[in-house]
Amino acid sequence: MIRSLSYCFLTIYFFLSILPLPNTIACPTRLLCRSDQRDALLEVQKELHVPTTTWNKNVDCCSWDGVTCDAILGELVLSRCKLQGEIPSSIGNLSHLTYLDLSNNQLVGEVPASIGNLNQLESMRLWDNDLKGNIPTSFANLTKLSELYLFGNQFTGGDTVLANLTSLSIIDLSLNYFKSSISADLSGLHNLERFSVYNNSFSGPFPLSLLMIPSLVHIDLSQNHFEGPIDFRNTFSLSRLRVLYVGFNNLDGLIPESISKLVNLEYLDVSHNNFGGQVPRSISKVVNLTSVDLSYNKLEGQVPDFVWRSSKLDYVDLSYNSFNCFAKSVEVIDGASLTMLNLGSNSVDGPFPKWICKVKDLYALDLSNNHFNGSIPQCLKYSTYFHTLNLRNNSLSGVLPNLFIKDSQLRSLDVSSNNLVGKLPKSLINCERIEFLNVKGNKIMDTFPFWLGSLPYLKVLMLGSNAFYGPVYNPSAYLGFPSIRIIDISNNNFVGSLPQDYFANWLEMSLVWSGSDIPQFKYMGNVNFSTYDSIDLVYKGVETDFDRIFEGFNAIDFSGNRFSGHIPGSIGLLSELRLLNLSGNAFTGNIPPSLANITNLESLDLSRNNLSGEIPISLGKLSFLSNTNFSYNHLEGLIPQSTQFATQNCSSFLGNLGLYGFREICGESHHVPVPTTSQQPEEPLSESEDQLLNWIAAAIAFGPGMFCGLVIGHIFTS
């Protein structure tokens, strides 16, 4: 019976010989620990700091915590035990081991050559450590090895030794630093089922010998530097292959017609290569395909018809190619199971493809960055499972129709950069789960949609560059937007003033991420379908496309409208705001000192308003503030002399005649305005200074008077 340790998963089975007893003794025998196995265990414990206190050489090791004596098995499992240091050479003394698992530890250095003594070993798992160097040549002795997991280390070579281990069924060398080409003939690995080397630096031609192994089920060569064409003509034996991943390489040429020989293929990824020409019609014969990724290549011509003629196909990504049209007649088969279609960033033109309405289970559709024209069809309302709809940057016209039925599943809608007119459809209120709404860059004429404020999950609202008009504050309307993180209403015709508490309810922008909640490398969108939300904003003075939006990014852009009155002091509550652009309005009054509370602010643009007073010195303490623009206001006083302000562009302060302190920012050669008397602070004079000034004034007056008197007297006497 295995006794589990409280601080790590530790199981050890050893092949231990049992002392022979006379045949006349009928009572059961007790398994005894062999001394050489016990000593080898103690050596491993000493060098790897195995976390157990019950291993005592004076006690039979069969009773140690985590040790079970078995007459046929020999297993050592020390996974996730926080082991440190190098694998000791003494591990080679455990000669009867059949299973070795040292994964998920902090092991360093090279694998000792003595590991080749474990000639009974069938499974080796060393993944997720910091092991480096070459795979030892002594691995050639591991003729019974069936499973080899070395992924997540720093190995650089020695992989050729594996070509002779004919018992191998699994080889996983992923996430290492292997650099060579796979030149060894692997066709002799007739038991191999899984071969994975993704995220290394392997180079050279595609290893065709892999395709001669009839037992292969899974091949992953992605994220390497393989180059040249790929051909399946001699792969008559690959009838079992289900997974082929070769994305993120330098493969080129045509996708071969011989791909039809992979009759059981289910997952195909050739993305991020240099394949050109048309997709072969023969791919439609691979009837078991469920996921196809051909994105980021140079494919052209007609969109392949297997997209809508397969009953098993679930995921298709054809984005970032040069496809330009659909077939003249598209007939969607009954039972089409497509849930995700990405045709973004191609050159497809013509009207919106209405056949898409017949794909009832469609979950995510991306037709962005093409040349589609005409109106958005009403029939899309019957696609009840829509989660993501991206029609960005086309030439679509007409109104945005009322597509959104009650209990809609829609999470993301992007129709930006088209020619849509009319008003926002009120049916959007049915999209209670929507997080992302982008209608920027159209010709929509409507008032501010206060009614969207009740949507509980709306994070991004992009209304910029349309013809919206009127106030954005209504005391009788609930402003809401409890989850808003990014709002862009720039370049419209909004007017009026904002109350001081206008931003008080935008709680998500004041949320401070802490500990494990920090969304590192997490982006807005659907990760499962690789459909990420994207926006364009003026960021640090430059029009910037955000292909992916970091979850922690918060922005407000109210620029290019006709807002008046004071900037609300409640803006200072939004401590996690990264971008604030209020330029091109008619705001008056002082810059609110509460801006200094926005500790993560990176970009601040208050230019082209009617602001007055001084730039708050406290803004100089914002350590992330890398871009500011205060130009063309009525500001005065000393520019804050902090490091953050000293690195700003000189043009950020132009058009403010009352500002001074430019020398540190603009250099000696720049004209430095001299503060006028009104700009200098007045100090009360002491009594002695006051008397002195009186005497100076009297003397100044007395001199000219005396001179004039002498001249006049001389005239009269003469």
Curated annotation (Swiss-Prot):
**Ranges that cross the membrane:** 696-716
What is this organism's lineage? Eukaryota, Viridiplantae, Streptophyta, Embryophyta, Tracheophyta
What does the UniProt keyword field contain?
A: Cell membrane, Glycoprotein, Leucine-rich repeat, Membrane, Receptor, Repeat, Signal, Transmembrane, Transmembrane helix
| Keyword Transmembrane assigned | yes
Name of the protein in question? Receptor-like protein 36
In this entry, the parts of the chain located on the Extracellular side of the membrane are 27-695
Q: Where is the signal peptide?
A: 1-26
| Chief location category | membrane
Instruction: Describe the family membership recorded for this protein in Swiss-Prot or TrEMBL.
Output: Belongs to the RLP family.
The cross-references to InterPro entries, in alphabetical order and at most eight, read:
Leu-rich_rpt, Leu-rich_rpt_typical-subtyp, LRR_dom_sf, LRR_N_plant-typ, LRR_R13L4/SHOC2-like
Q: What stretches of residues are LRR repeats?
A: 70-94, 95-118, 120-141, 143-165, 166-188, 189-213, 214-238, 239-261, 262-286, 288-310, 312-334, 335-359, 360-383, 384-406, 407-431, 433-454, 455-480, 481-505, 550-574, 575-598, 599-622, 624-647
In the UniProt record, does the keyword Transferase occur? no
For membrane topology, the record states:
Single-pass type I membrane protein
Cellular component GO terms, alphabetical: plasma membrane
- Intervals, Cytoplasmic compartment: 717-718
Per the UniProt entry, the glycosylated residues are 93, 141, 164, 199, 288, 373, 393, 528, 581, 597, 610, 629, 649
Indicate where this protein resides in the cell: Cell membrane
